[in-house]
A protein has these predicted regions:
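The feature captures the beta-strand-to-loop junction immediately N-terminal to the Walker
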Residues: 35-37
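Conserved ABC ATPase signature
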Residues: 137-141, 145
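Helix-to-loop junction immediately C-terminal to a conserved catalytic motif
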Residues: 50
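Conserved ABC ATPase "signature" region
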Residues: 95, 107-133, 185
Length: 283
């Protein structure tokens, strides 16, 4: 079953091409990890999926239908910096999305409906390891706990797609490992398709069922803005074979090693993108 399809998608800002002819099919329930150097279009790709940006050309389908222009309950998102409401308690942070969804009176519910949403929120907070912190404010939580809260917010409306924009970048290694376990559990226990941006290759291969690399392999300084990032599916074995390096190294330290593991678009003028759905290149 297909969850998301990018059909020849381009994203341009005037003469600046950010993404170039993206053809990508993402299966339902998959965990897609996106890697690549800064400025290569990973976050733009995520913003397209979230509905914050529109393709310049091409189309995006979700569940076989055109992507809705505005973010909705089907798409949850967690950013690198904790996207929580500082003036609300932990419990209220989780409840607020459902309250706005179901209430037509200033986002507030009362009586049985409010109790039902509160019970669900408490259960979710327990599931992400925040039981006992319901009445605290985000400022009283550690970084890892705030990210757990952001995850609870993101999945509270039972989305079909969870978007993660470098969600672990601000956490220390020990806390990151704990959140990795939590993310995998959430993904396994829910009907979720996950798309995650990360700069950490080992994290990408540890969590993802697929790893997609964004790269601008052409070297034409005079036409730098005329080419957008292409994508290609890459394996840990391909990276090691191309570079002789361990995938535990940080991506920003050695971005070219991903490029060495990908096809060279300039060698195939007719092929702007490495196929990612198992199809063979034309020709």
């Amino acid at each position: 079953m297909t969850a998301i399809v990018f059909d020849k998608v381009w994203k341009e800002y005037g003469d600046h091409v950010v993404l170039e002819r993206i053809d990508l099919t993402i299966a339902a329930r998959s965990f897609l990890a996106l890697v690549g150097p800064s400025g290569c279009g990973k976050t733009t790709f995520l913003r397209l999926l979230l509905g914050e940006e529109k393709p310049t050309r091409g189309k995006i389908l979700v569940g076989g239908k055109p992507l809705k222009a505005e973010p909705d309950a089907d798409r949850g998102v967690v950013f690198q910096r904790y996207s929580v409401f500082p003036h609300l308690t932990v419990l209220a942070n989780v409840m607020i999305g459902r309250e706005f969804e179901q209430s037509c009176l200033m986002g507030k519910l009362f009586g049985a409906r409010r109790r039902a949403i509160e019970d669900e929120a408490r259960h979710l907070l327990e599931a992400v390891g925040l039981k006992g912190h319901e009445d605290k404010y985000p400022a009283a939580l550690s970084g890892g706990m705030q990210q757990r809260l952001a995850l609870a917010q993101a999945i509270n409306r039972k989305p079909k797609i969870l978007l993660l924009d470098e969600p672990f970048g601000a956490l220390d290694p020990g806390i990151r490992a704990d959140i990795h376990v939590l993310i995998r559990r959430i993904w396994n226990e829910n009907e979720l398709t996950v798309v995650m941006v990360t700069h950490d290759l080992s994290e990408a291969f540890r969590l993802g069922t697929r790893v997609i690399a964004f790269e601008r392999p052409r070297n034409r300084p005079e036409e730098l803005e005329r080419y957008g990032a292409t994508i290609g599916e890459v394996s840990a074995q391909a990276i090691v074979a191309a570079s002789g390096a361990s995938i535990t190294q940080d991506f920003e330290v050695w971005p070219r090693k991903i490029a060495n593991a990908l096809p060279d678009p300039d060698s195939r003028p007719d092929l702007k993108i490495a196929p990612t759905n198992g199809a063979k290149p034309p020709g």
